Curated annotation (Swiss-Prot):
Protein name according to UniProt: Large ribosomal subunit protein uL3
Cystine residue pairs: none
Classification via HAMAP family: Ribosomal_uL3_B (MF_01325_B)
Superkingdom per UniProt: Bacteria
Any GO BP: translation
Assembly and oligomerization: Part of the 50S ribosomal subunit. Forms a cluster with proteins L14 and L19.
Region (Disordered): 116-149
Family: Belongs to the universal ribosomal protein uL3 family.
Biological role stated in the UniProt entry: One of the primary rRNA binding proteins, it binds directly near the 3'-end of the 23S rRNA, where it nucleates assembly of the 50S subunit.
Native organism: Shouchella clausii (strain KSM-K16)
An annotated Gene Ontology molecular function: structural constituent of ribosome
GO-annotated cellular components: cytosolic large ribosomal subunit
Keywords recorded for this protein, A-Z: Ribonucleoprotein, Ribosomal protein, RNA-binding, rRNA-binding
Length: 206
């Protein structure tokens, strides 16, 4: 069954394996999540649990009422986790980092850093033109396509807004679980800026 928890990206550091190997890790702070709702096929058409992380500062009345059913404070970051055995969880139950163990493979979903308006070279990894004297083509997008269609086809790599998108990194290994400080140490990097919210779930392709 799927396991999942919400957390906050703290940053990156490195730890040493028993054989002395240096492992770069991302530290994710995952304070106990609260189960806010259980969704069933009868009432919602599918099965899932809704979990919340981090108390909201200025909740509205609907959010307050929804959280009150779980006897908790309104949450700022709320997500649904599918594929969970509903018999094993109850509304108001806390989910902590011990859900996972060292060696587990997980998928981490976050929002990538916003880069603003960027050109085709940075945004689409295009090659630039020659920078030598006489060249009139340096960092431009290149050909817009053939003349005959009288238009630019969809999908043409052009400048535009970059980043700020939901991205999932798959099959990342959990190196260490720190129950005392509610920390998950995940091998490699995960999307998002420091202090951004991330979702950690069991790997789909593991």
């Amino acid at each position: 069954m799927t396991k999942g928890i919400l957390g906050r990206k703290i940053g990156m550091t490195q730890v040493f394996a028993e054989n002395g190997e240096v492992i770069p890790v991302t530290v994710i702070e995952a304070e106990p999540n609260i189960v806010l709702q259980k969704k069933t096929v009868e009432s919602d058409g599918y099965e899932a649990i809704q979990i919340g992380f981090a108390d909201a500062k200025k909740p509205n009345k609907p959010a307050t009422g929804h959280a009150a059913k779980a006897e908790t404070a309104p949450k700022r970051f709320i997500k649904e986790i599918r594929g969970v055995n509903l018999d094993e969880v109850e509304v108001g139950q806390a989910i902590n980092v011990t859900t996972f163990a060292a060696g587990d493979l997980v998928d981490v979903t976050g929002t990538s850093k916003g880069k603003g308006f960027q050109g085709a070279i940075k945004r689409h990894n295009q090659s630039r033109g020659p920078m030598s004297h006489g060249s009139r083509y340096h960092r431009r997008p290149g050909s817009m396509g053939p003349v005959a269609p009288n238009r630019v086809f969809k999908g043409k790599a052009l400048p535009g807004r970059m980043g700020g998108e939901q991205i999932t990194m798959q099959n990342l290994e959990i190196v260490r679980v720190d129950e005392e400080r509610n920390l998950l140490l995940v091998k490699g990097n995960v999307p998002g800026a420091k202090k951004s919210y991330v979702t950690v779930q069991s790997a789909v392709k593991a």
